[in-house]
Amino acid sequence: MRLHGQSLLAALLVNCLTNSHAFSTSVPSNFANTRQLSKLNSATEEASGEPSPDNSKDHDHAESVVYDPISTNTSFSSYKSKYAESIADPSAFWAKEANRLTWFQEPSKDHPALHGSFLKGDVKFFPGGKLNVCYNAIDRHALANGGKGGEDVAMIWEGDEPTDTKEFTYNEMLEKVSQISNALKSQGVKKGDVVTIYMPMIPELPMTMLACARIGAVHSVVFAGFSADALGSRISASKSKYVVTADIGLRGTKKIPLKTIVNDALTKMDCEKLVESVMVYERFYDKDAEDAPYEMTDRDVRMDQLVGLQRPYCVPEVMDAEDELFILYTSGSTGMPKGLVHTTGGYALYASFTTDVTFNLKKGDIFACVADCGWITGHTYVVYGALLNGGTTFIFESTPMYPGK
């Protein structure tokens, strides 16, 4: 497969595919970016006599390559056996799978792990169980192997420009997420409060999601491509008193004025009276600079400064298995957006289980998913799934088509 893109994302995906691990691979965390890989490809082509790509022309696409999916089910018969087990006794099946998670208090053995009716909508998982999803995604891996697990890379990020990259170990994630957790608390956020997150795909987005989970707040991520009207309607519907955003987002050569959109959204419906604090990650502008392209008000807080003042550890909140973890709104394409509530125990197990069974993700693997955190795929397969299983999640800002040469 000849590669024409210029990003670490593309390089990672090519490496994944050539290793027959669709979106999951065990490669060093400092894997070379695509500019280096392109040189390697060119040298290989020259040695083999195969012509190199014509660099004088733009290439809009690469040749399609289809690979069979990988699964922990090594045969169809083993899959059918597992499926039959889940159908024959769902409660026993999920009770066994719940051992994937670390519980502060084990679910009650006096009640079924799964009870209720999907038809009636009163389904509940793991009664009596107590846990924290952030602890399961970060702390337990950092503490593993006598604390050496904290040296493993938890997240790799590539910015809009391929040269803008960062890595975070599990120890660094624990410290940063704890500081954000304490920053949220300093603004009055408490267990059960809804925090609306309207951010680009920068490291602080999944970190803020995890921070909400850590303190028991309910995160409501709104896709950063939505309008002020769409954002305002979701803030109002969820009764969210807190908003976390960034000054701008980058998408290729475009700058998206996120803070300006938030300011506009707060004039919609009852948002002006509802929202108590807007926390802003400032990436490019000083709030006091004369050329700052947005307005800061008395309720706005400069998040970078606030986070820097916080202690590097926050005790995780003990959550009931049925406590709300997050709300995610439907797109609204078939009517008014509907806020779908995902609860702690059931969702955490779902994210861990499906990431394992579908992608065979193991510790040491790097997992890349091109979804945005504004959608459920991004929640599960960019943030929670890989981290719950102790892998490395790869996230990128902007679009996979940029830069396209």
Predicted regions, residues:
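N-terminal chloroplast transit peptides
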Residues: 1-26
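N-lobe entry segment of adenylate-forming
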Residues: 42-168, 172-175, 179, 270, ...
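Adenylate-forming
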Residues: 86, 138-142, 173, 177, ...
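Conserved AMP-binding/adenylate-forming core of the ANL superfamily
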Residues: 134, 151-210, 227-232, 299-308, ...
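Conserved pre-ATP/AMP-binding loop-to-beta segment of ANL
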Residues: 151-153, 275-286, 294-329, 336, ...
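A short helix-loop-beta submotif of the ANL/AMP-binding
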Residues: 181-182, 187, 194, 200-228, ...
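Structural core segment of the AMP-binding/adenylate-forming
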Residues: 210, 214-305
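Conserved AMP-binding/adenylation subdomain of ANL enzymes
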Residues: 346-366, 376-405
